[in-house]
Amino acid sequence: MKRVLTALAATLPFAANAADAISGAVERQPTNWQAIIMFLIFVVFTLGITYWASKRVRSRSDYYTAGGNITGFQNGLAIAGDYMSAASFLGISALVFTSGYDGLIYSLGFLVGWPIILFLIAERLRNLGRYTFADVASYRLKQGPIRILSACGSLVVVALYLIAQMVGAGKLIELLFGLNYHIAVVLVGVLMMMYVLFGGMLATTWVQIIKAVLLLFGASFMAFMVMKHVGFSFNNLFSEAMAVHPKGVDIMKPGGLVKDPISALSLGLGLMFGTAGLPHILMRFFTVSDAREARKSVFYATGFMGYFYILTFIIGFGAIMLVGANPEYKDAAGHLIGGNNMAAVHLANAVGGNLFLGFISAVAFATILAVVAGLTLAGASAVSHDLFANVFKKGATEREELRVSKITVLILGVIAIILGVLFENQNIAFMVGLAFAIAASCNFPIILLSMYWSKLTTRGTMLGGWLGLITAVVLMILGPTIWVQILGHEKAIFPYEYPALFSISVAFLGIWFFSATDNSAEGARERELFRAQFIRSQTGFGVEQGRAH
């Protein structure tokens, strides 16, 4: 059990980010014209969709939630497209390529947060909210303070995630396309701004759907060709892989990648609860018409992602067999050309030739675009809807709110490009871990307790939420990744790499203690309002649906 927990928990560094899979040194490849042409086709097609979407974005609801008219199936595909990343595809298959069986536990670890979203969050979130999760958190609590806290939690997560994605995008494109790093970062930033600025959630949704379909098709074809090579026998697949892998039979043994059980548990909790607190994922539940469609979204998304992560396992073992044993894909020193993260890309060449290699490379780039578009829209909505329209200028018109949102998109895009260039040679892997830790320590406790705990008050939410956020940031800075590796100190003050176990505990305890000891009249009123909130969260009575949403 300890081994399984350890391996499962260690998935966090690979979770939903392109940067972490390729955060080390990369070796620039020759210009891949097939990949560039296929990617240009994707860009032209998606820009056409953005133009089509821009003609249909007439209101705030259209911009933030595509009018609430996305079906459960479409939204499930879009969620999968938002969550399945280049790290999932390249990083996990590379992990299987080097470590074998552990990669399966890693693949399954990606799904561990989704049952929480399905059973605890999706239905109530849709019934209580309109555009952002702050709508839910502030439903019966004080609007101003809660929205500021929720927006800060969202923006910090989005900023960290976005920087990691931009750096990852630059390195990935350097690997796959042979393009200059700076050109790659600017290209991703400009396309991201165009999708969100003109097409809003409708364009973002269709970019994510198209990317998910392309990625699932590409991975399915690769897995099919691998299985065809071994006569559709898993026994043959594993036997041939063990025969050519340097570790031999040891690649079928689990565990051993994370030694410390406290770190393992902390990572696992960060991944599980962090997924349920990611603002760009939560925002997708407002794009459907009702709670039933929200539940269907999670059901379909989990199915698509589960299928995809099983494919990455087959692809990893296929790479051991068809790439690892082929000197054509090795350099003079005997290492894989471009590094181990190129294992899946080389396999694409091995099973489908140059044309399919170009297709897979283009899909990897499309993967990053889909993720950053969702992040940018989530960040913009936190500023325009939560802060501008509900805190700083109450009663702002829809037109004013949309103008602020689009200005925020431009600012976020420019900042992302600048920081992507500045962080080119920095260790940015910790940013994703910190983003998940903050989502788990600030956003998740607030969402969960606001929907389920009748005694929650504004005072408890504010003090506990800020404590969780600050604890996550401080412990991350004092931990070995930043304190030792980046700042150069000899020994870390906080001994564990990821802080989620401790910061989540601080957040929940803080919210409970300061709410339980809140004897104010305001606190009593907020507790009384829970009954009405509970009825709406269960029945959906009064929820705006579809185009009226």
Swiss-Prot record:
<dbReference type="GO" id="GO:0015123">
    <property type="term" value="F:acetate transmembrane transporter activity"/>
</dbReference>
<keyword id="KW-1003">Cell membrane</keyword>
<keyword id="KW-0997">Cell inner membrane</keyword>
<protein>
    <recommendedName>
        <fullName>Cation/acetate symporter ActP</fullName>
    </recommendedName>
</protein>
<dbReference type="Pfam" id="PF00474">
    <property type="entry name" value="SSF"/>
</dbReference>
<keyword id="KW-0915">Sodium</keyword>
<dbReference type="InterPro" id="IPR018212">
    <property type="entry name" value="Na/solute_symporter_CS"/>
</dbReference>
<keyword id="KW-0769">Symport</keyword>
<dbReference type="InterPro" id="IPR014083">
    <property type="entry name" value="Cation/Ac_symporter_ActP"/>
</dbReference>
<feature type="transmembrane region" description="Helical">
    <location>
        <begin position="493"/>
        <end position="513"/>
    </location>
</feature>
<keyword id="KW-0813">Transport</keyword>
<feature type="transmembrane region" description="Helical">
    <location>
        <begin position="262"/>
        <end position="282"/>
    </location>
</feature>
<feature type="transmembrane region" description="Helical">
    <location>
        <begin position="103"/>
        <end position="123"/>
    </location>
</feature>
<comment type="function">
    <text>Transports acetate.</text>
</comment>
<dbReference type="GO" id="GO:0006847">
    <property type="term" value="P:plasma membrane acetate transport"/>
</dbReference>
<dbReference type="GO" id="GO:0006814">
    <property type="term" value="P:sodium ion transport"/>
</dbReference>
<feature type="transmembrane region" description="Helical">
    <location>
        <begin position="355"/>
        <end position="375"/>
    </location>
</feature>
<keyword id="KW-0739">Sodium transport</keyword>
<dbReference type="GO" id="GO:0043879">
    <property type="term" value="F:glycolate transmembrane transporter activity"/>
</dbReference>
<dbReference type="InterPro" id="IPR050277">
    <property type="entry name" value="Sodium:Solute_Symporter"/>
</dbReference>
<feature type="transmembrane region" description="Helical">
    <location>
        <begin position="464"/>
        <end position="484"/>
    </location>
</feature>
<feature type="transmembrane region" description="Helical">
    <location>
        <begin position="183"/>
        <end position="203"/>
    </location>
</feature>
<keyword id="KW-0472">Membrane</keyword>
<comment type="similarity">
    <text>Belongs to the sodium:solute symporter (SSF) (TC 2.A.21) family.</text>
</comment>
<dbReference type="InterPro" id="IPR001734">
    <property type="entry name" value="Na/solute_symporter"/>
</dbReference>
<dbReference type="GO" id="GO:0015293">
    <property type="term" value="F:symporter activity"/>
</dbReference>
<dbReference type="InterPro" id="IPR038377">
    <property type="entry name" value="Na/Glc_symporter_sf"/>
</dbReference>
<keyword id="KW-0812">Transmembrane</keyword>
<dbReference type="GO" id="GO:0005886">
    <property type="term" value="C:plasma membrane"/>
</dbReference>
<feature type="transmembrane region" description="Helical">
    <location>
        <begin position="33"/>
        <end position="53"/>
    </location>
</feature>
<keyword id="KW-0406">Ion transport</keyword>
<feature type="transmembrane region" description="Helical">
    <location>
        <begin position="148"/>
        <end position="168"/>
    </location>
</feature>
<feature type="transmembrane region" description="Helical">
    <location>
        <begin position="428"/>
        <end position="448"/>
    </location>
</feature>
<feature type="transmembrane region" description="Helical">
    <location>
        <begin position="77"/>
        <end position="97"/>
    </location>
</feature>
<keyword id="KW-1133">Transmembrane helix</keyword>
<feature type="transmembrane region" description="Helical">
    <location>
        <begin position="404"/>
        <end position="424"/>
    </location>
</feature>
<feature type="transmembrane region" description="Helical">
    <location>
        <begin position="303"/>
        <end position="323"/>
    </location>
</feature>
<feature type="transmembrane region" description="Helical">
    <location>
        <begin position="206"/>
        <end position="226"/>
    </location>
</feature>
